[in-house]
Every structure is written in structure tokens, then in C-alpha cells.
Amino acid sequence: MSEQMVKEKPERAVIVPKQNHVLEVKDLSIYYGNKQAVHHVNMDIEKNAVTALIGPSGCGKSTFLRNINRMNDLIPSARAEGEILYEGLNILGGNINVVSLRREIGMVFQKPNPFPKSIYANITHALKYAGERNKAVLDEIVEESLTKAALWDEVKDRLHSSALSLSGGQQQRLCIARTLAMKPAVLLLDEPASALDPISNAKIEELITGLKREYSIIIVTHNMQQALRVSDRTAFFLNGELVEYGQTEQIFTSPKKQKTEDYINGKFG
């Protein structure tokens, strides 16, 4: 965890994190004005694993995801109660540098959103903003990030071409590479393949499986087969509540809750 994440000394001691967990969510509730969107969620997120969040539209899974790096702060009516511990520090606290937090917990959205700049400039934009000016360092990070995102071989000869000239699937992998360039520990993916064709979707899934060796990944998906293919653990949300959370195979083959079984079997959603 970067020291830059803490703006000032915490008011109370940092809690020793649980072994093998990158995040600990404790009694988290999220509100939009007077409407409660997420109700008292408790869950631990494993390191170097893929955690899938599933559930019908409006169940709270994306709201929950966006709160992990405080993207909900951008919504004036949004507020959160409870704790999200990252390396033992409550990242919902007022002493948190949110910009630094979002470097360590990066996010990729449903629709690819490359900047209207070159492929190279998309990767280096945030790095330069953070003060990095050494071209050799920037070149190295660009190649490393694009390689991790399985895009380097496709674009290495046109790095200074517009990112908007890439296909939708390539643009999404570029957005992943742009996030990886900031060297996050956690990667949040909000339905990253839902707007893509089947071939691009398969590439994104293959990429996710490979990235968990270095990153802890949380993915929101409406595609239950995708959750089954790529995730190690699955959380089922319904009406803002965490109904069931466990190993993906167990959730899909022998869920403990009837609501989970009904959703998995397509009885609603």
C-alpha cells in the first residue's frame, strides 16, 4: 500500500489484515439519498483470485463494486456506512487520498473508453500526470502493460496511431493496459466484455485468467457462464443484499440458498 494513500495519520490503529485476503468488507451499506442500495454486506476478497459478482439488474452489485475504489464519491447523493479494509486500512475513511487509492485499486468499465489520443499516449497519460517524464521508463511501461493485456503484438508497430482506430475488443484491452500501467494491486471490472463480440469476449476471459497471477480481480457480470469460466469465488446479490458467497463451483452446483439456486437455474433475473 502506498504511503500517498493516507493524507494524514489515521485516527486509530491500522488493523492487521487477514492472511490471503486483499479486501475485507464489514457491514457495508450504501445509500443514494434516502434509498438504501446495498444492505449490510460482509465478505472477504481473496488475493490473486477472481471474484465474480452476479445477480439481476439493479441488485446492487455494480454499486458495491464502484464503492471499492470510491467511484461512488462522484455521485453527490451517495454515501456509505461500514468499512472496506485494504491492507488493514479502512479506505472509506476521511484520511484517504482517493486519487492514490484509485491507482492501487484500478477500474475498467463496461464500455471501452479510450482517450482520443494515440495508443502510446493512452498508456502514458496518467503516468505523465503523476510526474513520470523519463522516456525510457515510459517506453518500458507501455510495452509491459500492453503485453500483460495481450495487445502488444497487435499494436507494437502502430503505437502512435489513434486508439480510436482499434476494434472494440482491442480498445477494451487497451483500457485494461492503461489501468495496469499504474501498477494496481486490485482490478475492478464492471461487465468488461458485455459490449463485445464472442471472439473479443473470449480474449478478455483468457486475459482475466492470466492476470490473477499478479492481481486480485473483482468482476461484475450478467453472464453466469462467464462467471463459471473465469472466477474462483462468486457472490450472488439480490435486492441489495449478499445472498450467498463461496467457491464458484459450489455456488453453481450446490448452492446453499434457494434464491441462489433459482437464479442460477434461470427462474428469475
Curated annotation (Swiss-Prot):
Listed EC numbers: 7.3.2.1
One of the protein's GO biological processes: phosphate ion transmembrane transport
Subcellular location, record wording: Cell membrane
Membrane topology label: Peripheral membrane protein
Listed InterPro entries: AAA+_ATPase, ABC_transporter-like_ATP-bd, ABC_transporter-like_CS, P-loop_NTPase, PstB-like
Residues that hold ATP according to the record: G55, P56, S57, G58, C59, G60, K61, S62
Pfam family, one: ABC_tran
One Gene Ontology molecular-function label: ATP binding
Main location: membrane
Signal peptide: none
Keywords from the UniProt entry: ATP-binding, Cell membrane, Membrane, Nucleotide-binding, Phosphate transport, Translocase, Transport
Keyword Protein transport attributed: no
GO CC annotation terms, alphabetical: plasma membrane
Record flagged with keyword Magnesium: no
Record-annotated ABC transporter domain positions: 23-264
Catalytic activity annotation: phosphate(out) + ATP + H2O = ADP + 2 phosphate(in) + H(+)
PANTHER family xref list: ABC TRANSPORTER I FAMILY MEMBER 17 (PTHR43423:SF1)
Function statement: Part of the ABC transporter complex PstSACB involved in phosphate import. Responsible for energy coupling to the transport system.
Subunit description: The complex is composed of two ATP-binding proteins (PstB), two transmembrane proteins (PstC and PstA) and a solute-binding protein (PstS).
Record family assignment: Belongs to the ABC transporter superfamily. Phosphate importer (TC 3.A.1.7) family.
Name of the featured protein: Phosphate import ATP-binding protein PstB 2
